[in-house]
Amino acid sequence: MPQHQNYSLSEEDVIQLVFRKYGVKITSEQIVRAYAPEQKMSWKKSVEVARFIKGMTLRQAKSWLEDVVKMKRPIPIKTFKKKQAHHAVPWSGWPVAKWPVKVAKRFLDLLENLENNAKFRGLDVERVVIVHAAAHKGYRIPNIMPRAFGRATRFDEQTVNVEVIAAELPKEVVPKRYKLNLVKR
């Protein structure tokens, strides 16, 4: 397995991203990263979870994902929703929602790592906001499934490279509550 850490955003890119989105200037000492290479989980579900936690504080993301593991709150599915069951989700604007438990557990481990990195750097964990989260396809592990009459079918096991970048922001721009479209039908 490759041990290199390929972040898709440099520190300058993160500083510009925070300035464009929140209107504050930060330094490179206020940025923390966590990277989990070659995780054996669904890439499509990882993309949806990464998209969902972007913009949340670290505490908000951890509490939401803990509820996903307990099957109390779902993750909205925005992109990969064709031929999916459209459950009667009680929130408008979410035609499809899922409970990706395995992916949520892996993201919780990654957010725990991110929180420890923030504490190590001396940042206030209550003001750490996730500014970038991404899931990229990793390498595929080839496998063979034996079939009847001496045949075999090849199938590949997918891996995912997950990265989360967060920044410590001033108190006035930290989101108090994550805004969701939670209007009851």
Curated annotation (Swiss-Prot):
UniProt-listed GO biological process terms: cytoplasmic translation
Residues spanning the signal sequence: none
GO cellular component, one term: cytosolic large ribosomal subunit
Keywords linked to the UniProt accession: Ribonucleoprotein, Ribosomal protein, RNA-binding, rRNA-binding
GO molecular function: rRNA binding; structural constituent of ribosome
Organism domain of life: Archaea
InterPro entries reported for this sequence: Ribosomal_uL22 (IPR001063), Ribosomal_uL22_euk/arc (IPR005721), Ribosomal_uL22_sf (IPR036394)
Family named by the database record: Belongs to the universal ribosomal protein uL22 family.
Function: This protein binds specifically to 23S rRNA. It makes multiple contacts with different domains of the 23S rRNA in the assembled 50S subunit and ribosome. The globular domain of the protein is located near the polypeptide exit tunnel on the outside of the subunit, while an extended beta-hairpin is found that lines the wall of the exit tunnel in the center of the 70S ribosome.
Subunit note: Part of the 50S ribosomal subunit.
Protein name: Large ribosomal subunit protein uL22
Taxonomic lineage of the native organism: Archaea, Thermoproteota, Thermoprotei, Thermoproteales, Thermoproteaceae
